[in-house]
Amino acid sequence: TTLKGEATFILGGVPGYGANGAPNSKGGGQTTLNDELRLNLYTSFSGKDLLRARWGAGNFSSYPFGTSSSNIFKLIHTENGNEQVFLDRLYYQFPIGEHNQFKLSIGALMRNNEITWIPSVYHSDVLDFFSTGGSSGVYNKALGEGVGIRWKQPLRAGKPAWVVNLNAIVSGSAVSSGSDSCTGGCSNGASGADSSDGILNAGSGINALAQVGYQGENWGVAVGYRFGTTQSAVRTGNGVAGVPLATGQQDNSVAINGYWHPHHAGWIPSISSGFGYNIVSGSSTAPAPQSSRSWMVGLQWSPPWETAHAAGLAIGQPANAAGATGSSPWLVEGFYGYQVSN
């Protein structure tokens, strides 16, 4: 059993960004210092299985870096909840099959991107959008009750292999206000669908994800698809592209992602790229989400003088309503990670 803690402090601001997320506002654009603390518990009964629980606390608000689903500036480490400690992960994973080629995941608090392979070697740990590989519709980090299964071709470690992932997560209206899937009207300690919806009701925020991928020795590619119902949402969408689906709406999201990295760390960077398209159907009233698309390209270097450290640069566009006459924002980030101790 292992208990791992992680404390994050973030100093920053978005000039001209309002407290309600509206740009060009007179207020809400000042510099702030926020914090987040995570405690991860990992335990195993057989050495091959995993029971994971995570507690979090923080003081972020929804904007400009926090938990709103339609927040393009959202950071990865942005727990809110007024420094209250809450449980936001609880699931169990175990292998199946003679060669452990299947892995089953089941739990009350699990996220689809953590039980699915996102083919990317760009890891900045800064802007949330780039952690989805540019496909925030398929890999939307839905959090709630769920089940998933993974099959990986049973070959020797490091050999090219096929990978298939299937999972379903319920992330409806009862998600935790402290969690980064809360869409409003939520309360600490709850997640997923409540008893008024049930886990299989179309209004409970169903996220059904399927993926087929291939892992080469130094490259990988995957095609993904997600079906979403009322209360599910595209991650970090711009404006109405990121709000939860209204009653009667459905979302069919598709994505293609891939990466390549050199065999040895040096001046040649690894490259990761992804594209996603989200088709929203069904009648609703405004402000309902619309069909959207997103993409990203990320480069990451491991310096030849110190392979434990890394630098990276990424560019992309978050999910923006397809054909919309409004702005089509671009996101750019650069980072350098330095390990200060061993």
Regions found by a protein language model. Name each.
Residues S61-Y63, M110-S124, A311-A319:
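Surface-exposed extracellular loop regions of Gram-negative outer-membrane beta-barrel proteins
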Residues Y63-T67, T116-Y122, G178, R235, ...:
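Outer-membrane beta-barrel and related beta-rich outer-membrane complex signature
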Residues S68-N71, V121-V126, C182-G184, N238-A241, ...:
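Flexible, surface-exposed loop regions and adjacent strand-edge segments
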Residues D194-D197, A241-P244, G282:
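Surface-exposed cleft-lining segments at the edges of enzyme active sites
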Residues G107:
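Catalytic Cys-His active-site segments of thiol-dependent hydrolases/isopeptidases
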Residues H123-D128, S176-D194:
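Internal alpha/beta core interface subdomains
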Residues T1-L104, D128-A168, S173, A202-I206, ...:
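Beta-barrel outer-membrane channel/assembly domains of diderm bacteria
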